[in-house]
C-alpha cells in the first residue's frame, strides 16, 4: 500500500491511496496462462494436497462460467480427493512420530501410506500429482475392476490405521 500525502504544516489535506498486490511466483505465472493450463499449475502449489487445489480451481472456474459437470464426474473428483486425503493424513501422522523420535512408528505409518501411494499410482498413473481434474469434469474414469482394487486396498489400510490410532491413543511415548 502506498500513500501520497498532501500536507500543510501538520495538517493532512489530501491522501492518494495506491493499493494492490505484487504478483510473484505462481500468481504471476497464472496471469500469463489460460484457464486450462492453470489447472496443471494449481496442482503444483503443494504436493501433499495437489488434488485439492485443482479440484477447487476447477469448481471456481465452472461456477463463474456456469458449467454444470456430470454427476459421475463429481463422484470421481471426490474419490480422487479422498484417496489423496488419506495418503496425506498418513504422511502427517508419520511426521509426528518422526518429530518425537518414534522411528519405528514413523516407518510403520509410512509403510501404510505406501499402500495409498500404490493406489494413486495404479488408478491415476502418478504418486503425487494425480492430474485427474479438468474444467468440466475429470480426465479419467474409474472402471469396476479399478474400484474393486481400491476397495481391496482400503480393506488392508483400515485395520492398519486402527492399529496406528491405538498406538497414538495408548502409548506413553506419544
Where does each model-flagged region fall?
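Active-site bordering "gate/hinge" segments
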Residues: 1-174
Amino acid at each position: 500500500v502506498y500513500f501520497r500525502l498532501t500536507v500543510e504544516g501538520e495538517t493532512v489535506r489530501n491522501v492518494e491511496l495506491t493499493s494492490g498486490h505484487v504478483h510473484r511466483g505462481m500468481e504471476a505465472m497464472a496471469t500469463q496462462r489460460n484457464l486450462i493450463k492453470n489447472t496443471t499449475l494449481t496442482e503444483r502449489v503443494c504436493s501433499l494436497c495437489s488434488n485439492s487445489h485443482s479440484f477447487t480451481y476447477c469448481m471456481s472456474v465452472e461456477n463463474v462460467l456456469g458449467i454444470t459437470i456430470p454427476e459421475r464426474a463429481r463422484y470421481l473428483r471426490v474419490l480422487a480427493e479422498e484417496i489423496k486425503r488419506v495418503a496425506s493424513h498418513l504422511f502427517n501422522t508419520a511426521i509426528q512420530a518422526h518429530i518425537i523420535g518414534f522411528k519405528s512408528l514413523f516407518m510403520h505409518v509410512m509403510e501404510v501410506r505406501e499402500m495409498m501411494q500404490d493406489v494413486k499410482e495404479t488408478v491415476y498413473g502418478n504418486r503425487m500429482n494425480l492430474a485427474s481434474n479438468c474444467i468440466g469434469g475429470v480426465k479419467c474414469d474409474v472402471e469396476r475392476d479399478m474400484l474393486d482394487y481400491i476397495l481391496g486396498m482400503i480393506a488392508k489400510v483400515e485395520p492398519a490405521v486402527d492399529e496406528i490410532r491405538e498406538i497414538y491413543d495408548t502409548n506413553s511415548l506419544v
